[in-house]
């Protein structure tokens, strides 16, 4: 078999996009969704593998700016739209695309690569580590009292058209991005994705709605939601399906939840993604009624170990020598001395004795502060070579806020 790995040409994009959908068992996108995907695609960063005239594998990358502990706007390549046709599985095409991408990211000076995974077990062998968790909520509003905080009555709530409120909602989101690791500065045009509302995507729910929360005339929070009607013998038991919820302060956040709790003909609220340190379980009397479930969301891979570790700050002072294994990107292998604190950091090559040993995958998992080095060591994935080196390094990698990816890509 002779195949060619290369960049996608403009005239090939529609076929490339259709092959992506086919690999995921989906129908080709209708025109409106296709236009949104095309606008979000960086064609110059989209690659594929061709067997003759047939596109048999796809992969793309997006030029993100990622918030990391102590810093916002760190360049990160967002790996996306990865597929291999079933006729060409287990022939090394995915490995070739991953290697090609990482070399390209390095050449572009992007110290990090990030992705979300439909099958997480695939990407560990390429150095991607689970770095953030999602908390999914199914809140039993029939048995829970709504949150109450002083000042909530000063918050004005208005139902508005989701598209008309886009600019106000995006300003709220943009103000939150620098504060939490894992959040991405949205690329131009991505706000349109947030309000797509095709009937075949609603899963039985009604139209997408938006409530904005104002204080003194300023929009300080919003929720996008739909109501899924459910009728049982005993009466209505609908579900409020929340797509997005952001707020700039605790009072506005509680006011939005009080609104969602009180929607008529419903008995629960479902929300697919919140950070694991979300306030809602602490705002209600019985957190068991919040139906919390966890799953990994964002995967991180240091492309250049030195640049990546120097791009963030550290919760406590750190001075440690790391022995890094990275057979997929051998330029990262070897010993690195990491020194840093809350004001900045450096990470340089060294010949000093290593104190901790780990792979680049573990560095990715620890990078945003979502998984402690001590926890990774307990799983046998980090080795303490100098007694006493692990605990202070683990504390230094921590984050005041849990990392969170609010949306996929």
What is the role of each PLM region?
Residues 139-147:
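Aromatic-anchored glycine-rich loop motif in surface-exposed flexible loops
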Residues 2-14, 69, 149-409:
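Intrinsically disordered, low-complexity, positively biased terminal segments
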Residues 98, 103-117, 264-275:
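Conserved GNAT acetyl-CoA-binding A-motif
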């Amino acid at each position: 078999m002779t195949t060619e790995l290369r960049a996608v040409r403009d005239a090939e994009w529609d076929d490339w996009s259709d092959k992506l959908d086919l690999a995921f068992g989906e129908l080709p996108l209708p025109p409106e969704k296709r236009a949104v995907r095309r606008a979000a695609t960086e064609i110059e960063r989209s690659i594929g593998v061709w067997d003759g005239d047939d596109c048999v594998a796809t992969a793309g990358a997006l030029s993100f700016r990622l918030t990391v502990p102590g810093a916002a706007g760190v360049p990160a390549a967002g790996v996306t739209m990865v597929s291999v046709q079933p006729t060409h599985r287990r022939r090394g095409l995915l490995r070739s695309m991953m290697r090609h991408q990482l070399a390209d990211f390095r050449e572009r000076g992007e110290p990090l690569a990030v992705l979300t995974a439909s099958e997480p077990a695939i990407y560990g062998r390429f150095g991607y580590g689970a770095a953030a968790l999602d908390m999914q909520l199914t809140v039993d509003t029939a048995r829970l009292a709504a949150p109450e905080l002083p000042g909530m009555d000063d918050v004005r709530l208005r139902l508005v058209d989701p598209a008309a409120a886009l600019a106000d909602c995006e300003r709220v989101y943009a103000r939150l991005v620098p504060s939490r690791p894992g959040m991405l500065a949205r690329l131009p045009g991505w706000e349109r994705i947030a309000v797509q509302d095709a009937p075949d995507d609603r899963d039985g729910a009604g139209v997408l709605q938006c409530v904005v929360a104002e204080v003194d005339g300023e929009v300080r929070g919003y929720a996008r939601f739909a109501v899924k009607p459910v009728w049982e013998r005993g009466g209505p038991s609908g579900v409020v399906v929340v797509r997005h919820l952001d707020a700039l302060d605790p009072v506005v956040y509680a006011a939005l939840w009080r609104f969602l709790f009180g929607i008529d003909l419903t008995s629960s609220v479902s929300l697919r993604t919140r950070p694991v340190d979300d306030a809602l379980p602490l705002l209600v009397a019985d957190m068991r009624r919040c139906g919390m479930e966890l799953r990994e969301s964002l995967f991180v891979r240091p492309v250049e170990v030195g640049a990546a570790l120097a791009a963030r700050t550290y919760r406590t002072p750190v001075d440690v020598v790391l022995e890094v294994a990275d057979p997929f990107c051998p330029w990262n292998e070897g010993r690195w001395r990491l020194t840093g604190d809350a004001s900045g950091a450096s990470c340089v090559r060294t010949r000093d004795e290593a104190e901790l040993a780990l792979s680049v995958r573990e560095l990715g998992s620890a990078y945003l502060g979502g998984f402690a080095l001590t926890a990774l060591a307990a799983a046998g994935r980090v080795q303490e070579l100098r007694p006493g080196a692990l605990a202070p390094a683990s504390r230094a990698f921590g984050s005041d806020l849990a990392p969170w990816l609010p949306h996929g890509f």
